[in-house]
Amino acid sequence: MSMEYLYFCLAAPIAVAILCLEDRGKQTMDFLFAGMTGCLLSRYITDFVAVRYAANAMVAAVEIAPVVEEGFKFLPFLVYLLIFKPKKEWITGDMFALALGFATFENVWNLVENGGAGIFPILLRGLGVGAMHVVCASLISIGLLSMWDSFYLRVLGTVGLFLTSVAYHAVYNLLVLSRFSWIGHLIPLVTMISVLLIRSSKNPGTDEKGNSPGTSTREHA
């Protein structure tokens, strides 16, 4: 099956949802659609660069694909921040939608291209790919949010976060293509679960007395 046919099958319902929804629902679908489109375009560019420089499959997966794919996630998100200036509470969710659109198309295409070796390997790969893209999205969105108010940190942080996400992606691809592929799929899952546990243990929505930010003691009297 052609990659373009698969893209149209997956993206068409999302395009219909974009036309029907409004406000936050529409915005989430926009980013999901952008993620799938970015995945398709990144495949074209990765294949072109690999052919241009006669790179083998390993070099393409470890040295070319991470840069191209993270670029297609990072640049639209950066433009979104600079031009539309969204509310801070929207940013992480929007980046997640972009990453999940990317991961969804990548998973389906890999299944069509390589077939399946059983439900467990397919499930492990699906969770691993999804977690890897979500971890990279979290790194970028949370990192930029924490440094956005300072111009110098914003400039340096943008470069640093992009390179870190590329390195994480490259290590994942390297392990997945080795005989330790299961370790490659487990690393982003463990990373994601660890981050969720740390966030839940800190209870960011409350202060030391259990009050929400901006809530006075008098209101609880």
Located regions from the model:
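Hydrophobic alpha-helical segments at protein termini of multi-pass membrane proteins
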Residues: M1-A221
